[in-house]
């Protein structure tokens, strides 16, 4: 007989079950006190200014605005350059 006790909090999440995924996201711990926050885009800010602030925040290790706070990796830094080029090209297309 197994001595391991699976409490309800420790049970693995069934990733095919939407409500279980939502429970995990909704019950995520609060950000620690003093955590840096991505600035809200104010009416006076242009999109470019806000994006610049957003990337500065990620470079400092701020939470990215999704359910998974994490620090920026070198892959993200490489991708951000690629992503900016892709965005610029897609905006210049005359579709």
Curated annotation (Swiss-Prot):
Pfam families: UK
InterPro entries, alphabetized: ASFV_DP96R
Family as reported in the entry's similarity comment: Belongs to the asfivirus DP96R family.
Protein name from the UniProt record: Uncharacterized protein DP96R
Lineage of the organism: Viruses, Varidnaviria, Bamfordvirae, Nucleocytoviricota, Pokkesviricetes
């Amino acid at each position: 007989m197994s001595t391991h006790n699976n409490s309800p909090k420790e049970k693995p999440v069934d990733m095919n079950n939407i409500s279980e995924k939502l429970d995990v996201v909704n019950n995520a711990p609060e950000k620690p006190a003093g955590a840096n926050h991505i600035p809200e885009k104010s009416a006076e800010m242009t999109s470019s200014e806000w994006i610049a602030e957003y990337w500065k925040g990620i470079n400092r290790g701020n939470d990215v605005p999704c359910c998974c706070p994490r620090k920026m990796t070198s892959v993200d830094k490489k991708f951000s350059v690629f992503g900016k080029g892709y965005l610029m090209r897609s905006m210049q297309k005359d579709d």
